Amino acid sequence: MAGDESLVSRVADNGGRLRLRFVRLGDRVHHTVEWLDPAMAATALIESREGQASDNWPASPPLQQLLIEPRGAAGHVALLVGMAGRSHWSLSIEPLADRVGFRFDAACRIGGPPGWLGHTWRIIPGCPAPALPESQALPGSPAEETGVVGFRPAVDAPGYEARFDSGCLRIVAEDGAECFLESSGMADARIDPMGESPGQTVETIQNGSRSSECRVRATSALAMVATGRFPATVQWRFVIEWVPSST
């Protein structure tokens, strides 16, 4: 890839859209999800967290090559490939036809039982977000200081969402995948996968002192481990979509 490249979603009812912007960081293709308002002004919302070159099972797939090509009525599709250790990853991303967002189709060819296999994102510090009610603020942090946002369970989908001033960004698991949250500011802190623990505590980012990451894990890998048959190809799918604010 040469410089920044991007993929855009269909246009929302309010005239805005999502943009997936790719940029090279070291040997990895990193991506940021942005909201474009009707005037095409961009607000960066979340970004992928990459691993180190020495990681056999990095936080996100170690994608090193990117090709964006036309794909009929869908507009364009992003095709990415990469490798780490003895494993090979591939990822295709295309705009959703009926929603404002993108579908991610991932695969990994593994030679043995995998460690972590999935994706990780964090909310970009400083992005505009509504203040949370005091009941959802972290201990010792008054609600009026909560000019930030965290991930929380989505009400009607197997995933998590982050609410911003102009709408809601959702990460939703589909085939062979599950979503969960992990706090990088507390040892062993974790929120269980969606639907297993009703009434979960909302994780938030507070003044940069604590952050929660949304992760998509390839649960389809568990079946591969149970059979013990390697090498094997693991596949999983998920969606990142935008729901504009109604106000």
Describe every region a protein language model picked out.
Residues P133-S135, A143-C179, M186, R217-A223:
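Long, charge-dense
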Residues L18-F22, H31, L63-I68, A73, ...:
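Generic structural motif
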Residues M1-Q52, G159-G185, W242-S246:
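Beta-strand-rich N-terminal accessory domains
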Residues G101-G150:
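Acidic (Asp/Glu-rich), glycine- and aromatic
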Residues E50-G115:
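Extended, loop-rich substrate-binding clefts of extracytoplasmic carbohydrate-active enzymes
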Residues S48-R49, M83-G85, G111, G115, ...:
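Beta-strand-rich recognition/accessory modules
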Residues S90-R99, G118-A129, E182-A187:
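Extended Gly/Ser/Thr-rich low-complexity repeat segments
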Residues D13, A84, A97-R99, F164, ...:
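Surface-exposed coil/turn segments at beta-strand junctions on protein surfaces, enriched
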